[in-house]
Amino acid sequence: NHTQIDNIVIVASEMWQGYIMSWIGKDNLSKFSGFAPAGSSRQHSIVNGLIKAKSIGAVADDNIIIHDAARPNVSERIISQCMDRLSEYDGAMPVLPVKDTIYLSENGENITSLLNRDQLYAGQAPESFKYGKYLEIHNGMTEDDLSKVRGSSEIAYKHGLKICMIPGDECNYKITTKEDLNKFIREMEEH
Protein backbone atom coordinates (compact mmCIF):
# COMPACT_ATOMS: atom_id res chain seq x y z
CA ASN A 1 0.00 0.00 0.00
CA HIS A 2 3.00 2.34 -0.13
CA THR A 3 2.18 5.47 -2.12
CA GLN A 4 5.50 5.41 -4.01
CA ILE A 5 4.89 1.91 -5.36
CA ASP A 6 2.68 1.68 -8.45
CA ASN A 7 3.26 -1.93 -9.55
CA ILE A 8 4.48 -5.11 -7.92
CA VAL A 9 6.14 -7.93 -9.84
CA ILE A 10 6.71 -11.13 -7.88
CA VAL A 11 9.53 -13.41 -8.96
CA ALA A 12 8.72 -16.99 -8.00
CA SER A 13 9.01 -20.49 -9.36
CA GLU A 14 5.86 -21.74 -11.04
CA MET A 15 5.24 -24.30 -8.28
CA TRP A 16 4.70 -21.45 -5.75
CA GLN A 17 2.65 -19.09 -7.89
CA GLY A 18 -0.76 -20.63 -7.08
CA TYR A 19 -0.05 -20.46 -3.35
CA ILE A 20 1.10 -16.84 -3.66
CA MET A 21 -2.04 -15.98 -5.66
CA SER A 22 -4.21 -17.33 -2.84
CA TRP A 23 -2.56 -14.82 -0.47
CA ILE A 24 -2.76 -11.99 -2.99
CA GLY A 25 -6.51 -12.61 -3.18
CA LYS A 26 -6.85 -12.47 0.61
CA ASP A 27 -4.88 -9.22 0.84
CA ASN A 28 -6.55 -7.58 -2.18
CA LEU A 29 -3.15 -6.64 -3.59
CA SER A 30 -4.32 -4.34 -6.38
CA LYS A 31 -0.79 -3.29 -7.38
CA PHE A 32 0.18 -6.86 -8.34
CA SER A 33 1.20 -6.82 -12.01
CA GLY A 34 2.20 -10.43 -12.55
CA PHE A 35 4.86 -13.03 -12.01
CA ALA A 36 8.35 -13.38 -13.43
CA PRO A 37 9.99 -16.81 -13.40
CA ALA A 38 12.65 -17.62 -10.82
CA GLY A 39 16.16 -17.81 -12.22
CA SER A 40 19.07 -20.11 -11.51
CA SER A 41 20.47 -17.56 -9.01
CA ARG A 42 19.20 -14.61 -6.99
CA GLN A 43 20.52 -12.10 -9.51
CA HIS A 44 19.16 -14.07 -12.46
CA SER A 45 15.75 -13.92 -10.75
CA ILE A 46 16.17 -10.15 -10.40
CA VAL A 47 16.95 -9.85 -14.12
CA ASN A 48 13.76 -11.81 -14.87
CA GLY A 49 11.86 -9.34 -12.69
CA LEU A 50 13.44 -6.40 -14.52
CA ILE A 51 12.40 -7.89 -17.87
CA LYS A 52 8.84 -8.41 -16.60
CA ALA A 53 8.77 -4.79 -15.38
CA LYS A 54 9.71 -3.65 -18.89
CA SER A 55 6.88 -5.74 -20.35
CA ILE A 56 4.35 -3.89 -18.17
CA GLY A 57 5.69 -0.48 -19.13
CA ALA A 58 8.72 0.34 -16.98
CA VAL A 59 10.89 3.04 -18.58
CA ALA A 60 14.50 4.09 -17.97
CA ASP A 61 13.80 6.91 -15.52
CA ASP A 62 11.40 4.86 -13.36
CA ASN A 63 12.43 3.99 -9.83
CA ILE A 64 12.43 0.34 -8.85
CA ILE A 65 12.74 -1.32 -5.49
CA ILE A 66 13.98 -4.89 -5.05
CA HIS A 67 12.95 -6.81 -1.98
CA ASP A 68 12.96 -10.46 -0.95
CA ALA A 69 10.53 -12.54 1.06
CA ALA A 70 13.22 -13.36 3.62
CA ARG A 71 12.78 -9.88 5.18
CA PRO A 72 9.03 -9.60 5.88
CA ASN A 73 9.37 -6.78 8.45
CA VAL A 74 10.40 -3.93 6.15
CA SER A 75 9.04 -0.58 7.30
CA GLU A 76 7.35 2.19 5.38
CA ARG A 77 10.20 4.49 6.48
CA ILE A 78 12.82 2.30 4.82
CA ILE A 79 10.86 2.07 1.57
CA SER A 80 10.28 5.84 1.54
CA GLN A 81 13.92 6.68 2.21
CA CYS A 82 15.15 4.21 -0.41
CA MET A 83 12.85 5.74 -3.01
CA ASP A 84 13.44 9.37 -1.98
CA ARG A 85 17.22 9.07 -2.31
CA LEU A 86 16.90 8.20 -5.99
CA SER A 87 16.53 11.91 -6.74
CA GLU A 88 20.26 12.25 -5.92
CA TYR A 89 21.70 8.74 -6.33
CA ASP A 90 21.56 5.80 -8.74
CA GLY A 91 20.61 3.49 -5.89
CA ALA A 92 19.93 3.28 -2.18
CA MET A 93 20.04 0.54 0.42
CA PRO A 94 19.42 0.28 4.17
CA VAL A 95 22.42 -0.64 6.29
CA LEU A 96 23.25 -1.23 9.93
CA PRO A 97 26.62 -0.48 11.51
CA VAL A 98 28.50 -3.69 12.28
CA LYS A 99 28.52 -4.32 16.04
CA ASP A 100 30.94 -7.21 16.24
CA THR A 101 34.66 -7.14 15.69
CA ILE A 102 35.35 -8.49 12.20
CA TYR A 103 38.44 -10.53 11.44
CA LEU A 104 39.86 -11.55 8.08
CA SER A 105 41.28 -15.03 7.69
CA GLU A 106 42.74 -16.12 4.38
CA ASN A 107 42.93 -19.79 5.36
CA GLY A 108 40.03 -20.17 7.80
CA GLU A 109 42.36 -21.10 10.65
CA ASN A 110 44.12 -17.97 11.83
CA ILE A 111 43.55 -14.22 11.76
CA THR A 112 45.15 -12.47 8.81
CA SER A 113 43.98 -8.96 9.66
CA LEU A 114 41.50 -6.96 11.68
CA LEU A 115 39.00 -4.83 9.77
CA ASN A 116 37.97 -1.38 11.01
CA ARG A 117 34.46 -1.87 12.38
CA ASP A 118 33.78 1.89 12.08
CA GLN A 119 33.88 1.53 8.30
CA LEU A 120 31.79 -1.65 8.02
CA TYR A 121 28.05 -1.89 7.48
CA ALA A 122 25.68 -4.83 7.09
CA GLY A 123 23.42 -4.42 4.07
CA GLN A 124 19.69 -5.06 4.20
CA ALA A 125 16.86 -5.08 1.68
CA PRO A 126 15.04 -3.52 -0.04
CA GLU A 127 17.39 -1.86 -2.47
CA SER A 128 16.21 0.81 -4.88
CA PHE A 129 17.62 1.84 -8.25
CA LYS A 130 16.97 3.90 -11.34
CA TYR A 131 15.42 1.25 -13.59
CA GLY A 132 17.28 2.00 -16.82
CA LYS A 133 20.73 2.21 -15.26
CA TYR A 134 20.20 -0.93 -13.22
CA LEU A 135 18.88 -2.92 -16.17
CA GLU A 136 21.75 -1.75 -18.40
CA ILE A 137 24.52 -3.03 -16.12
CA HIS A 138 23.23 -6.56 -16.70
CA ASN A 139 23.80 -6.41 -20.47
CA GLY A 140 26.25 -9.08 -21.57
CA MET A 141 26.33 -10.85 -18.22
CA THR A 142 26.31 -14.64 -18.37
CA GLU A 143 24.46 -16.93 -15.97
CA ASP A 144 27.84 -17.66 -14.38
CA ASP A 145 28.44 -13.92 -13.87
CA LEU A 146 24.98 -13.53 -12.32
CA SER A 147 25.52 -16.50 -9.99
CA LYS A 148 28.51 -14.76 -8.40
CA VAL A 149 26.55 -11.65 -7.37
CA ARG A 150 25.71 -11.66 -3.65
CA GLY A 151 23.68 -8.48 -3.37
CA SER A 152 21.73 -6.17 -5.64
CA SER A 153 23.89 -3.18 -4.73
CA GLU A 154 27.12 -5.16 -5.21
CA ILE A 155 26.71 -5.31 -8.98
CA ALA A 156 25.59 -1.67 -9.12
CA TYR A 157 28.63 -0.49 -7.15
CA LYS A 158 31.00 -2.59 -9.27
CA HIS A 159 29.57 -0.95 -12.41
CA GLY A 160 30.13 2.58 -11.10
CA LEU A 161 26.63 3.44 -9.93
CA LYS A 162 26.45 5.81 -6.96
CA ILE A 163 24.73 3.98 -4.09
CA CYS A 164 23.47 5.79 -0.99
CA MET A 165 23.28 4.12 2.42
CA ILE A 166 20.24 4.87 4.57
CA PRO A 167 19.70 3.83 8.20
CA GLY A 168 18.45 0.26 8.39
CA ASP A 169 16.38 -1.28 11.16
CA GLU A 170 17.11 -4.20 13.50
CA CYS A 171 13.48 -5.31 13.02
CA ASN A 172 14.18 -5.75 9.30
CA TYR A 173 16.12 -8.96 9.92
CA LYS A 174 16.55 -11.74 7.41
CA ILE A 175 14.90 -15.08 8.13
CA THR A 176 17.56 -17.64 7.24
CA THR A 177 17.71 -20.00 10.23
CA LYS A 178 15.19 -21.92 12.29
CA GLU A 179 15.90 -19.50 15.15
CA ASP A 180 15.07 -16.54 12.89
CA LEU A 181 11.81 -18.20 11.87
CA ASN A 182 10.88 -18.98 15.47
CA LYS A 183 11.58 -15.34 16.43
CA PHE A 184 9.34 -14.13 13.60
CA ILE A 185 6.54 -16.53 14.59
CA ARG A 186 6.73 -15.33 18.22
CA GLU A 187 6.54 -11.71 17.08
CA MET A 188 3.50 -12.45 14.89
CA GLU A 189 1.75 -14.24 17.75
CA GLU A 190 2.35 -11.25 20.04
CA HIS A 191 0.70 -8.87 17.59
Where are these regions (language model features)?
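Conserved N-terminal catalytic core of the sugar/cofactor nucleotidyltransferase
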Residues: N1-D61, T142-D144
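Short beta-strand-to-loop acidic/aromatic patch adjacent to the donor-nucleotide binding site
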Residues: A58-R71
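Hydrophobic packing residues within well-ordered alpha-helices of enzyme cores
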Residues: I20-M21, C82, F184
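Glycine-rich beta-alpha junction loops
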Residues: P97-D100, E170-C171, E179
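Hydrophobic helical membrane-anchoring modules
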Residues: N172-H191
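Residue-level signal for inorganic ion chemistry
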Residues: G49, H67-D68, P97, K130, ...
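Structural beta-sheet core signal
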Residues: V9-I10, I66, G91-P94
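Conserved core of the sugar-phosphate nucleotidyltransferase
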Residues: A60, N73-I166
